[in-house]
Amino acid sequence: MMVKLRNLVLFFMLLTVVAHILLYTDPAASFKTPFSKRDFLEDVTALTFNSDENRLNLLPRESPAVLRGGLVGAVYSDKNSRRLDQLSARVLSATDDDTHSHTDISIKQVTHDAASDSHINRENMHVQLTQQTSEKVDEQPEPNAFGAKKDTGNVLMPDAQVRHLKDQLIRAKVYLSLPSAKANAHFVRELRLRIKEVQRALADASKDSDLPKTAIEKLKAMEQTLAKGKQIQDDCSTVVKKLRAMLHSADEQLRVHKKQTMFLTQLTAKTIPKGLHCLPLRLTTDYYALNSSEQQFPNQEKLEDTQLYHYALFSDNVLATSVVVNSTITNAKHPLKHVFHIVTDRLNYAAMRMWFLDNPPGKATIQVQNVEEFTWLNSSYSPVLKQLSSRSMIDYYFRAHHTNSDTNLKFRNPKYLSILNHLRFYLPEIFPKLSKVLFLDDDIVVQKDLSGLWSVDLKGNVNGAVETCGESFHRFDRYLNFSNPLISKNFDPRACGWAYGMNVFDLDEWKRQNITEVYHRWQDLNQDRELWKLGTLPPGLITFWRRTYPLDRKWHILGLGYNPSVNQRDIERAAVIHYNGNLKPWLEIGIPRYRGFWSKHVDYEHVYLRECNINP
């Protein structure tokens, strides 16, 4: 019995020893397959680097400045190398996250202490990752050399290759300026040749589709040459200093160019093109050659008919006014019911009348008035008219030393001295017998029938307008001075702004609420421009505060005079498109993408336009 018990104990002891051997020994270690290393490398990017950073020697650590300068470049030799760049970028990112506390180590120490090991490790990493990805990449669809996608998850910018070629040129020029590269005459000749090839490939290309088919070959060749330069250059700190100097210089040039662009844009916006100066002169001459009976418009009995659709348009630009009228009538379901009330200044009065006498807008009715004939509109009645004629206001807009202020340059446009801009606050006085008027700016184009706006119930409000809450800079605090207690106590800084340019005004409600008097009171308070500075929108926001009914956005789309990225679908659906901003469609600085919406309503074969050399 004792013998059996002893044997049983020995058996269990032996079993315990064998179990430990089996548990702590990797049975797969003895099986060497060609995939073992590759399978390990596939998990490299998923590793968590919590241990000492020196254990991870896959890639040499580069300083953040070097990475930003573009010294770690991707060699786009083929689709495998593109996959390599993605994996390498993830490894670099993971390494950088856990070594953030070590960023104060100098560039020189990093680049010199690890120079030899870095070169070997980088080559090993390239070979291993290329082997790893060679089979997987074949399963992916072949990407276009200048396509929009690298993979199904990441959408590439349409100018990615153009940017990369430009980056190559910058890096190449840096290498040319370094002493170690200059000492190698063969490398310098090759690099200069590559620079010329890339410059010819780029030419004036702004997106990848503009590049020639050979551009990808030039890109690859340049990368190979730059790789040689990286081997020649052993002092990375010199490269970093050079790139930092270039970056500082580029930033300074950008600042100067931005300031110059802003100034020239403002100057161009305030300048009348030669053709638009010629046009009213020719029209005025021909108008006064007519006899008095020929100077009259037909259908003047319709001017006060409240059953018709009445438009108010205040402008000194003959061509722009004609586009507004033509586009409105072209899209109107019942042109006979539309009446246009145009008010202009003394200089353009004859020209405006002559244009519409010579180019009547179909069956619609036209009225052209001279603002100086409004005898009731004088400085004793209108505070703004008194302010516009004051010496301080003229100095504010015209004195030369003010142009040194970048922030206030846009506020000093003399167009704001024109009373035509402020007539919108006197609609009941101009049209005393009308009940509802649709106000239109002269920089809009009508694309749909607008008669439906007269049936919109404003629910007791005076102004019907499209709100502009979609952008943060279109709220009250961007137009009014909320540091002034008069503003901060009466208005909400985050309240939605709204758009001038297409507004429905209920003139009966206007009179009932005495809106003109509200406007006058706030203009008196703003005599020193402490409440607002720019134009007519700020006083409009104040005057119609809590008296504005929000219209559907489809009625009015803005931004075509300053924003080159307005959604095309929004433009096509809008009833009115507005070229608010300095880039007007009749100026050479107008955004080309939007000019066609405006120019299609201009007959450039008209005799007056040909004689004044006004072309599309």
From Swiss-Prot:
Pfam families: Glyco_transf_8. Expressed in roots, inflorescences, siliques, leaves and stems. It is a single-pass type II membrane protein. One of its GO terms (biological process) is cell wall organization. Residues 132-152 are annotated as: Disordered. Coiled coil: none annotated. The chain crosses the membrane at residues 7-29. It is an enzyme of class 2 (transferase). The keyword Cell wall biogenesis/degradation applies. Glycans are attached at N291, N326, N378, N481, N514. GO terms for cellular component: Golgi apparatus; Golgi cis cisterna; Golgi membrane. CDD domains: GT8_like_1 (cd06429). Residues 30-616 are lumenal. Residues 1-6 are cytoplasmic. May be involved in pectin and/or xylans biosynthesis in cell walls. This is Probable galacturonosyltransferase 4. It comes from Arabidopsis thaliana. The gene is GAUT4.
